[in-house]
Amino acid sequence: SIILLLFFSPCLRAGEWQWSVTLDGFVSNETNRNPTAFLWIPADCMQIKAIIVGQHNMSEETLFDNPLFREKMQKLGIGFVWITPGIDQQWDVSKGTQRIFEKMMADLADVSGYSELKNVPIVPIGHSAMATYPWNFAAWNAERTLAVISLHGDAPRTNLTGYGRENLEWGRTRNINGIPGLMIEGEYEWWEARVNPALAFRMMYPESCISFLCDAGRGHFDVADETAAYIALFLEKAVSLRLTDEVTKDGKVRLNPINPAKGWLAERW
């Protein structure tokens, strides 16, 4: 019957997540429980090169479950951590968010056996109301951030946060210089006022590496294969240009900074 065909269709199955841990030190006001962090490691991966960290908003899980995206991340040796419910739209370290994150990564390292998770490079990703946190994560974790993805999202240090409240103040010395960042806006959600803070940011921080993608033909909630492929290509280039075999004194992989003065800059059209 049609019902049985739908039931057994492999296209309807959610993606596999091999491990999970409960986050200590935080109780969600959505569930009145501790959130859960789910970990996906690519098949046959002996050592993880990087982890994409997304909090539960709308499109993060859809991207993580996309078969094309998983296939490309498997080739790169990049895994996923998905936190549900989310813990912080701002990434405010004064609230203990950083400590919760580091404990989560240590717990996932222990339960999975991938000890490198404690210090592996991170790609923060967030959609809509969670689209501001990736930039702030990078500002407070510059040495560990491989790249930043703001999906149908926000500009760094924007005054128009997706969650509708004030943004965090970085201070005079904190920056994301040399870290490739990608701000994605759908064609049918485009608002110039959301882009302007990113243009101003690039002028204020000339060593920053902010890229833009107008997601043609897409709206706020779309996660198309073409978009997933573009993000994968962006991360492939970040891996090839930034990862080194060197390790810092605190055990982190040393990342090469990207120089925006080298390469090509495309004008808007």
Predicted feature residues:
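A domain-start/cap signature at the N-terminus of enzymes
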Residues: 12-51, 96, 122-145, 149, ...
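Active-site-proximal beta-strand/loop segments in catalytic clefts of secreted hydrolases
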Residues: 42, 54-58, 83-86, 125-129, ...
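Short substrate-entry loop that stabilizes the transition state in hydrolases
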Residues: 44-92, 157-158, 191-193
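Loop/turn elements at helix/coil->beta-strand transitions in domains of secreted/extracellular proteins
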Residues: 46-51, 76-81, 118-121, 142-147, ...
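Alpha/beta-hydrolase active-site loop
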Residues: 91-117, 136
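The feature captures the conserved acid-bearing segment of alpha/beta-hydrolase catalytic domains
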Residues: 146-232
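Alpha/beta-hydrolase-fold serine-hydrolase catalytic core, especially in secreted/extracellular enzymes
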Residues: 208, 216-269
